[in-house]
Amino acid sequence: MHVLFLGDLMWIYLLLLCCASCNGRPDPRKRDALIGLEASRRTGGDITLNEREKLLDGKLQKLKQHDMEAGQFPPSMHFFKAKRLIDQSPVFNLIQKMPKGAALHVHDFAMVSVDWLVKNVTYRENCYVCFTDKQTVQFIFSSGPPASSSYCSSWTLLRSLREKIKNTTELDNSFIRNLTLFTEDPDRAYPNQDTVWERFEQVFLVAYGLVTYAPVFKDYLYEGLRQFYEDNIMYVEIRALLPQTYELDGRLNDKDWSMAACQEVVNQFKKHHPDFIGARVIFTVHRKINATEAVKTVEEAMILRRNFPDVMAGFDFVGQEDLGRPLWYFKDALSLPEDKGFNLPYFFHAGETDSQGTDVDQNLMDALLFNTTRIGHGFALARHPVVKEMARKMDVPIEVCPISNQVLKLVSDLRDHPAAVLMAEGHPLVISSDDPAVFGATALSHDFYEAFMGFGGMSFNLGTLKELALNSLRYSTLPSQRKEEAIDALLVKWDKFVWESLL
C-alpha cells in the first residue's frame, strides 16, 4: 500500500531538485535516486524482502531473464498460442506453487475445467444431448425423453449414443470444443470483439443445462473450489447469475435454494480443507435488462443479502459492456438501497471497453459515484485521469484479468495492457482470471504469469508477487478480523513457499 501524499511530495521535490541543478552533466547520484524512487512507486515497490526472499528473488530474476530472451515471449502472443510455452516455463512453475491469496473476479459457469464437465457430468445417468441447428449442443437431465423446443427438435440419451458409436473420444472432444473458446487460429476464428463475444456467450448457454441441474450445481461448485484450492488460492468471490436450478422430475428451485446450496458446499469444503478461508457470492444480472427489471433485481439482491449475509457479498451487472445499457441508465434502481437505508455493496464491471467517448465509457465514473467496492476490469481507466485519481483516493481497486482482456480482443500484446501503467504507479489492483475454464487456463496461475511477465518485464520482482497476493485479501469482502487472520495465514504459507523454493 502506498502513502499517496507523502510519495507525491517526495516525487515533486526530487524532480525540482534535479531540474534546478541541471547543468548539462547529470549527477549520477540523482539519477540513481530517481530510479529508486520510481521503483518504490511500483506495485510491491515498498515491500522489504528478507534475506531468504532476496535469494529467491535472485533465482526468479534469472528465470525471468531466460523467458524474456527466448525466441517467443508468451505475453506478446495470443494466450491460445502461448499456453504451451507458459506451461513449460520455470517462472510459471514457481507461480503455481506460490500462495496467491484470493481470486476476486471469477464467474460461476466458467470456474471448473471443461474436461471435468464433459468426462464427469455428461457421463452421469439421465443426461440428454441435442445437436442444434446453430451447430452447437444443448444438454439436459431428465427422467424421460425431454420435450422438443424451438432450438432442440430431438434429444438423445447420451449413454445410448455412446454405446452406438465407436469413437467416444471424438464425441467428448466435440463437447469440449463447444464449451471453450480455444482454437488453433484465434485471429481467424474471432476477427472482432462482437464475434468473440457472441461465441463467448454461446459457451455459457451450452454449459447451462449441465450446471443448473441441482445435483451437478453443488458438485460443480465443490469441484470449482477444489481446482482453485489446488492452484494455491485460499478464498474466492464468485460472480453468480443464480439461475433457477432444476430437479430430475422438472421441478425448479429458486435463488434462495441456490444461495443455501452455496453456503452448504462452502462449509463442506472448508470442513475438508481447514486452511481454506471460504467463498462468497456476488449476485449478477445481464446488463441488457430494462429499468423495471433492474428495480426488481436490486430488490431481490437486498433480500438475498438480508437472508444470507455470510455468503452474499453484493451485486453487479455482466455481459458485453459495449452492447449493454450503461450504469447511469440504472440510476434509479441502484439508488434504492441507499434510499431504504440498506447496505448493498456494488462490484461493477466498468471500463471493459475501448470505445472512448461513448455512454458506456462513462461507466467507470458512474461506478465510483455509486460507491462501488471494486471495479471489474477497468481497462479504460488510464484514459480517464480524473476518475483514476478518484479511484486511488477512494482506494477502489481494479480487478485486472489479463487473459480475458486479450481473448476478448481489448488488447493483443499484454505488454501494452493499461494495467502496466497502473502497476508502475502503484495503483490499487488485484489480478484475477474471469472465466479460466472457457479460456483453457488454470484457476489463477496463468493470469499471474501474464501480468508478472507482461506488465512489468524485468522491473517486477518477488515483492510484486507478494503484494498482489496480499492485495487480494486486503480488497476482499471478508470482515476485518477474518481478513487479518487470512493475511496472517497467507504470510505463513508465503514463508513456507520461499523456504521450499530455495531447497
UniProtKB/Swiss-Prot annotation:
Cystine residue pairs? C130-C152
The catalytic activity of this protein is classed by the Enzyme Commission as 3.5.4.4
- Coiled-coil region list: none
What is the residue range of the signal peptide feature? 1-24
Q: Which residues are glycosylated?
A: N120, N167, N178, N290, N371
Active-site residues are E352 (proton donor), H377 (proton acceptor)
User: Which cellular compartments is it found in?
Assistant: Secreted
Which GO molecular function entries does the Swiss-Prot or TrEMBL record give? adenosine deaminase activity; adenosine receptor binding; proteoglycan binding; zinc ion binding
Q: Which reaction does it catalyse?
A: adenosine + H2O + H(+) = inosine + NH4(+)
Question: Which residues make up the binding site for Zn(2+)?
Answer: H105, H107, H349, D434
Return the CDD domains for the record. ADGF
Where is the major localization of this protein? secreted
Residues where substrate binds:
D108, W197, E198, R199, F200, E201, Q202, V203, F204, H286, G319, D435
Task: Please list the GO biological process terms of this entry.
Answer: adenosine catabolic process; inosine biosynthetic process
Q: Which InterPro entries match?
A: A_deaminase_dom, A_deaminase_N, ADGF, Ado/ade_deaminase, Metal_Hydrolase
Name the cofactor(s): Zn(2+)
GO cellular component assignments: extracellular space
Question: What is the annotated role of this protein in its UniProt record?
Answer: Adenosine deaminase that may contribute to the degradation of extracellular adenosine, a signaling molecule that controls a variety of cellular responses. May play a role in the regulation of cell proliferation.
Q: Which family does it belong to?
A: Belongs to the metallo-dependent hydrolases superfamily. Adenosine and AMP deaminases family. ADGF subfamily.
Extract the NCBIfam families matched here: adm_rel
Protein name per Swiss-Prot or TrEMBL: Adenosine deaminase 2-A
Which species is this record about? Danio rerio
